Structure formats: C-alpha cells, structure tokens
Amino acid sequence: MSDKDSKNTPQVPEKLGLSRRGFLGASAVTGAAVAATALGGAVMTRESWAQAVKESKQKIHVGPGELDDYYGFWSGGHQGEVRVLGVPSMRELMRIPVFNVDSATGWGLTNESRHIMGDSAKFLNGDCHHPHISMTDGKYDGKYLFINDKANSRVARIRLDIMKCDKMITVPNVQAIHGLRLQKVPHTKYVFANAEFIIPHPNDGKVFDLQDENSYTMYNAIDAETMEMAFQVIVDGNLDNTDADYTGRFAAATCYNSEKAFDLGGMMRNERDWVVVFDIHAVEAAVKAGDFITLGDSKTPVLDGRKKDGKDSKFTRYVPVPKNPHGCNTSSDGKYFIAAGKLSPTCSMIAIDKLPDLFAGKLADPRDVIVGEPELGLGPLHTTFDGRGNAYTTLFIDSQVVKWNMEEAVRAYKGEKVNYIKQKLDVHYQPGHLHASLCETNEADGKWLVALSKFSKDRFLPVGPLHPENDQLIDISGDEMKLVHDGPTFAEPHDCIMARRDQIKTKKIWDRNDPFFAPTVEMAKKDGINLDTDNKVIRDGNKVRVYMTSMAPAFGVQEFTVKQGDEVTVTITNIDQIEDVSHGFVVVNHGVSMEISPQQTSSITFVADKPGLHWYYCSWFCHALHMEMVGRMMVEPA
C-alpha cells in the first residue's frame, strides 16, 4: 500500500507543505547527483542509483537456515538490557537482561541473578549505553562484554560463552556512569568508566555548592577480571565519553561542563571545554607507591588529577577543544583521539604520538597536540572508522552521516586546500552513535555501518505517541555509503558494536561445573543433595528447600507441601542434554518465574503466603506434552 492510500499514515497539515518523507523522497536522487558532482564524481542517474541500492540490499539478505557474518551487540538504554542482533540481516537473536528484571529468564528474580547483582538488586531499572567486547592486542577476544548503567552508577560484565551477566559492580563515590571503554592492549586489564555528574564529597547533605573545592567527579578504572575497583582519578569539570589508545598508556575523555554548572545556560557558557588525557602508567605507579587517598568507606585508591594553581598533575593533561564536546573515539589506525564538537561543527583530532611530549612538558601549548579540526556539519556527536583512512561522523542537527578522510583533514589544518569531505548521507532522523564493523579494534574492515537514529518519525507504521528508534544499516564497502535497511528498536539503544561471528564462541549446553550457579551447588552440598539425581524436600524451621530435577516433560517433584508463611526455595536442575530444550518454572499467582536450560541449575526463593493449592508449570514449550509438565504446591494454613 502506498503512503497516499494509507489511512494510518500521520497527516501533515496543508499549510506545512510536504512532509519530511515526501521532501526527502522527492529530493533523494537530486541530492545524490549534486553530492556526486560536488565531490568530483560522476552524476548518477535515477536508474544507476536504484541499481546500486538494489545490489546493496541483496548483500543483507540472509536466507532461511543461513547465518549472519557478524554478531551485533546493542545497548538497551533505559530498558536496562543488551540485545544481540545478526548483521547484516538485523534480526534480533537474543536479549541479555542485565540491570532490568526479566520474567522470561527470571533475571532479577532468581537467587543466582540476585547474587550477581548484589546490593543493587533492589533497583528495578537501569540505563545502559555503551557495550564493548574485551580485547587482546587490539582485537576482540570474545571473552567478555561490558556495559554501563547510568541510572544507578553500575558496570556489568557479560560472559559471551553463555550470553549471561556474571559480574556487576556499583562504582563508589560517584554518580551516573556514562562513557565506558576498555583498555585495548596488551589486553583488557581495565574497564574505563566516566562518572558524568559532579557531586560534593562527602555527599551528606551539608554542601550543595558545585563550585566548592570538594565538589567533583572522577574517572574510574575497574579490574576487568575481578570486577573490583582499581583506581579513581579526580578531574576538573565533568566527564562525558571516553576511549583508550593502542599503546596501553593513554586514555582520554571529553568534558562538556568545565563550568561546573547545573543549569543549561551555565553549562554552555565557555566557548571551549576540553578533552582530559590520562597517563595510565603514571597512575599505576602512584597506586603501587601508595601515593593516594581513599574516600568514605571505600578502599579504592583515589588520585587527584586536577590542575593546582595552573599547574598540571602528573596524571592528566587538559586539551582545550570547542564547546561541549561529546564523542571520544580512537581511530582504528591508532593515530588519533577524535572529539566530536556537538555545539561546534567541528571534530578535534588529537595526535596520540604527541602525548608523551605533552606530558613531558615539551609542548608550549596543550593544543599543539591538535593536528586537525575539520568542519563537518551541524551537531557532530560520534565518529567511527573503516580501516581505509576514512572517518564517519554523525551530524545530529543535519540528520546526516558524513564521510571524511583523516589525513586530508590534517593537511587542510596545515593550510592546504583539500576537500576532506567525501560524502554526506541523509539518515532518519537525528543520529547519535554510529558504529562500523570492527571499528574500535585494529581490524576495522569497512563493510557495514549502523547509524542509531534517535527519531523514527514516519519511517514505520504508527504505534502511538511513543515511537521506536531507527537503527539504519549502511553499506560502506565501496566508495559511497548506501542506506540499505531501517530497523525499529524499542527504547532506547544508544550504541552498538559488531564482531565477526568467528570471534564469539558460545556453549550449546551448560557445563555442570559452571561458576554461574556455584553458590547454589554449595547450598545443595550442605543439604547432602546430589543435584543431578535427587528430588527431595528439606525443612529447616520455617524455611523449606525443594530440590528437583527436570526432564521434559516432567518435574522430578510433582507435589510438595508447605505451611503458610514458609520461605520456600525451589532449586531445579535440567538434566536434559539436548541443545535448545530449555525448561521454565512458574508458580501461579506468586510472581515466580525462571529459566532452566539444559544442564543448568536455577533456584528461586519466595514466601508461600496464601493457603491452598497452587499449581506450578513449565513455561517453555519444551515437549509435545508441555502442557502436562506441571506440579502442585499445597500450602497449609498457619
């Protein structure tokens, strides 16, 4: 059905003329021709453009039974989860609950998940932005994925062999973990996490003045293996996004609130903010020497990276850049930190090989490390790379992705007349993050790019006032970008990454010795239970522990009796050994639900507060007799 025939398409008042869809549709071919002419290329006809788009669309077709070339990991934003997509098909493969409660798997309900979440299990929400895969020698090693929670100041780790969160930490002394990146070489030793908001220290309600000397935020490093704090560095201003270099020595972060303001006008007052660069080796040496303080009850080493009386600390350098910078991205060739201007139409290119001289005091001006500042368009937010010397930056206000050549931008900064902009592509609409395949590694392959647009407007069937986001897949394998797919997503992915499918190795069934459910195994041992075979009920005062196996289509315990008010823990081990035969356990009217996949042990605790007969059943369709996979909990009145 065409738009003009659809009665479910939002109408545009006549006085406003064409809708944006109509305008862009009418001008697409003309715009492409003008762009090609401006860039010195051949003018594309309507037919040649249509053929090019058709060929690109054929690349994304993944037929029935065929597999995608890449794993894509999307942050779930304020949904609090991570989503796994296949690329280029853009099919959603799995959702990994992290900071949210998930009734399908029982995440946030099961004892195993709550043990991992720790004290923060009390929070039912999260806001995750930046997923990143662990690396060795600048390449994805497929071991872990890390994700931030801005809402409750947490960082979580996901084991990629099982696609489950296995560690979580609340970062002390700070609020709102936003930017998150990983050390790239020699391996991911640290997870670098920006705390965005400035708070008083101690934050005990006695001081609210952000200009106070003891009001600040910190740059945080977490040990990637133990998921414990490694160190924190106090900074001037606030922190937005971050990235690390390919030497293992430097990390950098953008600051958009050098004013330490709390109001919109105040945060835009300065014409320049900065990128703060951290010397990780200097920080490590100070920690090793015991040259640090601690704050409150936390034992985390804290170092002061602020300027004192105009003098730099040995840990940091502040590089002025145009106002309110946002994205901070390391080029895949390892040469540059690139800070996107946001309120400036420029990106600032920091030459990483000049940073040792900056820290050694050999440069007269911190801006001597800036080797390029290309003007790209309105609202530059984030930059990605194709491994062929080109960068791609989102332009939020212009609703475009701009492709530009980095070395030509450096030449232009020196005064040479060169057109470093290669193409501008309309996206729909207002893009934030973007990510090219393997772009944050030294193996960037320049095949696919995803632009994560914040508004979808008229791109999909209307679904009410809340619209989906629009994640658009772009073919960048040739000389020109080609938009090939619109992907609606629920609120609100911020960023994504792509890894080759050979870089991710997953288990087909659980290992019975997996540490994920080790605390539950230990509990069973204390009760003298063999989880692989035993089906028993153990009473310990008003605590009842029900142990059972499950093999489709039957639970090992088909009924058990408790008293009203008992605390009941049900532990189930799925002894099926067939891939994909997952079981579920739901107790009706009790808010109890969990997943038990093959060879997995899961447990859940609840209070049997209602007398009477209560059925439990398998919520997964695991067998032809799935409906008959039930049991009874009989609750005697108190």
UniProtKB/Swiss-Prot annotation:
Cofactor mode of binding and number, as noted: Binds 2 calcium ions per subunit. Binds 6 Cu cations. Each subunit contains 2 copper centers; Cu(A) (binuclear) and Cu(Z) (tetranuclear). Cu(Z) is thought to be the site of nitrous oxide reduction.
Signal peptide bounds: 1-52
InterPro entries: CcO_II-like_C, Copper_CuA, Cupredoxin, N2O_reductase_N, N2OR_C, NO_Rdtase, Nos_propeller, NOS_propeller_2
Sequence positions that bind Cu cation Z2: 129, 178
Location in the cell: Periplasm
Pathway: Nitrogen metabolism; nitrate reduction (denitrification); dinitrogen from nitrate: step 4/4
Binding site for Cu cation A1: 583, 618, 622, 629
Cofactor(s) this protein requires: Ca(2+); Cu cation
Residues bound to Cu cation Z4: 494
Sequence positions that bind Cu cation Z1: 326, 382
GO terms, biological process: copper ion import; denitrification pathway
Binding residues for Ca(2+) 1: 454, 469
The keyword Disulfide bond is assigned to this record: no
A Pfam family assignment: nos_propeller_2
Listed transmembrane segments: none
Keyword field: Calcium, Copper, Metal-binding, Oxidoreductase, Periplasm, Signal
Binding annotation for Cu cation Z3: 130, 433
CC terms in the record's Gene Ontology section: membrane; periplasmic space
Stretches the record annotates as COX2-like: 542-638
Post-translational modification: Predicted to be exported by the Tat system. The position of the signal peptide cleavage has not been experimentally proven.
One Gene Ontology MF term: copper ion binding
Chemical reaction(s) catalysed: N2 + 2 Fe(III)-[cytochrome c] + H2O = nitrous oxide + 2 Fe(II)-[cytochrome c] + 2 H(+)
E.C. numbers: 1.7.2.4
Subunit structure: Homodimer.
Full protein name: Nitrous-oxide reductase
Species lineage: Bacteria, Pseudomonadati, Pseudomonadota, Gammaproteobacteria, Pseudomonadales
Gene: nosZ
